Amino acid sequence: MRSIFTDKVSDTMPLPEYPRPQLVRDGWQNLNGLYDYKISDSSEKKPKDIDGKILVPFAPECFLSKVEKGLKPTERLWYFKKFSLNDNLKGKSILLHFGAVDWECKVYINDTFVGSHIGGYCAFTFDITDFLRDGENELSVCVFDPTDSGWQQRGKQVNKTHGFWYTATSGIWQTVWLEAVDSCYIRKLDVVPDIDNNLISIDIDLSAEMKGVKIKARIMDGDSVLAEKTVKQHDEIKLKKYEYWSPENPKLYDLFITVSVGDKAVDSVKSYFGMRKFSIGRDKKGITRLFLNNEPYFQKGLLDQGYWCDGGLTAPTDEAMIFDISEMKRLGFNMLRKHIKVEPMRWYYHCDRLGMLVWQDMVSGGAYIGDFYAGVLPNVGIYKLKDNKYNRFSRGDKKWRRNYYEELEEMIKQLYSVTSIYCWVPFNEAWGQFDALKVCDFVRSLDSHRVIDHASGWYDQGGGDIDSMHKYILPIHLRKSKKRAFVVTEFGGYSNIVRGHTWNEKKAFGYLMFKSKESLTKAYKKLLDKQIIPIIDKGLSGTVYTQVSDVENEVNGIYTYDRAVLKIDENVLKDINSQLRY
């Protein structure tokens, strides 16, 4: 199936944009493009022949990859790419970056093993300087991905699609790129704004301990210098004058960091930040609310699964990423709940600069918990089950739980400085849920500056900052909580098949189906008018309607899967969103 962006995808260099806007250097080289590939048996020996060409970074299962073939749990997917360093990278140390590879991969340069990584959703890096030779080099990657036959974090990926379970994403699905650095460089830069004390905190992780290191920071607003300071690796920078960041005013400031050893500058990077504060608090009526910049702020959101009919988990172009964010904002929404997926860093950058709040889910794992726990009990109003009986929600093995913690920490550290991320969501509807209270404490220990929805939807353990309700069948009712803000974190899901713009019309799935745009719009308006708007003054602090677009057989998007047709009248969407406020 083609999207409205399919024809804009380059066969030689798809997604050519700089992949990490939060930490920008001049010396880099994009390795996206056509690779040789081979799907082999379980042997990890380098194959002698190839099956054909694959367009990276699109997974083999999707249309844009030019393969359109899945990877079995017993197979290995091999990639081969010959490359030479661009002139501006020569004479430096070379880092090889992968935005994401699903799930386990081993990386080789010129047939020499470089390193491995486990986890399908986060970025990782290898220093390949000592493996390179003059002239042409070869990158080889071997991937193993068990999808739903394994226990790993994988979201809704399955080997056999049905309902709201989707086509797997195997192998490389985000940008592959090279970066040139010196012997001492900034490995990681964290920035935390503090509007209560008019400052930012910075944390700079250097690759090496060296004598005579000096670090200079400069904060810019366009051409104007707001602050300059020689800083330590852990330091604060005061700001005298600034604007708050918000969806209505997504003001960002540039941050330039230069590292010198003696008189020589060894690293220079550009970053950015927004001055904002996320919290919960009491309004004038004493109701616990979501707060933005110390003021109550109603969040009107959409569930955003980040799937594309032509690219799977990979947006076909940067423009496509921007479309979903800017179009939802144009329709009056101010929040996206990024549902059990971690996006490329450019997606978060676009949310930062366009002004879109993000609730970030952790990717779910474990085996399916079964229809009784996943559907029957919650839909008759039973939410009070403890999650420390690990087999109940498919986390019986210690290694499953340990791996979850490892990947959760990896995600939070990667996204820590994203301006727009408002809330962490460790668990969704009990899929692989365990020890949610302890996990909430763990998340808080990593990041105390954001709100936490510790168990979105079903089996609430009474922790976190959000009293989180999912309602698709029974009527929505208000739950009052003194300590937590009440948010309907999933609802609606009203469905409509648009002929010629649907993945599979015969297998189309939805909770409540409507025959036309008019009937769908009327039902949407009635749902919001009758069940949402009346309870805002009484305690509702935010909503998440399901969802941004159709996804495969699931036809409950406000847009079709190809992003060609808006299925609900835009004037109604805008009018209702204008009423969703305190």
Residue ranges of model-derived segments:
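N-terminal pre-domain segments of enzymes
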Residues: 1-28
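N-terminal carbohydrate-binding accessory modules
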Residues: 189-193, 256-328, 579
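Substrate-binding/catalytic cleft of secreted carbohydrate-active enzymes
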Residues: 326, 335-576
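Aromatic- and glycine-enriched glycan-recognition loops and surfaces
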Residues: 71-77, 90-92, 124, 251, ...
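Accessory beta-strand-rich segments of carbohydrate-active enzymes
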Residues: 21, 36-42, 69-185, 209, ...
